[in-house]
Amino acid sequence: MAENRRNDREQSEFEERVVSINRVTKVVKGGRRLRFAALVVVGDRNGRVGFGTGKAQEVPEAIRKAIEAAKKNLITVPMVGTTLPHEALGVFGGGKILLKPAVEGAGVAAGGAVRAVLELAGVADVTSKSLGSNTPINVVRATVDGLNQLKRAEEVAALRGKSVSDFA
């Protein structure tokens, strides 16, 4: 009973979005084995976001596994108001994602998988450009890499042993 209540609370805390579902086959002696691979992004629209992949013989089971994996793989995104603190270039494999802060009210200028990650992270104003590979998993991983590179002015000042006013 307590386990069930915890799951209900967890479900309301995070929003999830299925980025892609891929049918994969394995050729065996007796023919082909079909399975489904799901890529899911979860976030609380308040600075926390994660992604996960799941594989199963049925689509709902693959999605459930991907959601579980995503909740174990959360990162915190530093934000300045509704946008990012500075530019970042995320790279994973052949995929590169350029993330740029935008003025308030500009919205999320991003496509597909990048939009899912940024919206669920709670970033409301950002411009992005996808370069290289457009495979959904590479794009999501590159976006998360770019978000991991972000630092607030206070963090940079502390690392350099200066005050924030020295940078202005």
Swiss-Prot record:
Belongs to the universal ribosomal protein uS5 family. Part of the 30S ribosomal subunit. Contacts proteins S4 and S8. This is Small ribosomal subunit protein uS5. InterPro entries: Ribosomal_Su5_D2-typ_SF, Ribosomal_uS5, Ribosomal_uS5_bac-type, Ribosomal_uS5_C, Ribosomal_uS5_N, Ribosomal_uS5_N_CS, Ribsml_uS5_D2-typ_fold_subgr. With S4 and S12 plays an important role in translational accuracy. Located at the back of the 30S subunit body where it stabilizes the conformation of the head with respect to the body. The keyword Ribonucleoprotein applies. The keyword Mitochondrion does not apply. GO terms for cellular component: small ribosomal subunit. NCBIfam families: rpsE_bact (TIGR01021). Transmembrane segments: none annotated. Gene3D superfamilies: 3.30.160.20, 3.30.230.10. HAMAP family: Ribosomal_uS5_B (MF_01307_B). Residues 14-77 form the S5 DRBM domain. One of its GO terms (biological process) is translation. The N-terminal domain interacts with the head of the 30S subunit; the C-terminal domain interacts with the body and contacts protein S4. The interaction surface between S4 and S5 is involved in control of translational fidelity. It comes from the Bacteria. Keywords: Ribonucleoprotein, Ribosomal protein, RNA-binding, rRNA-binding. One of its GO terms (molecular function) is structural constituent of ribosome. SUPFAM superfamilies: dsRNA-binding domain-like, Ribosomal protein S5 domain 2-like.
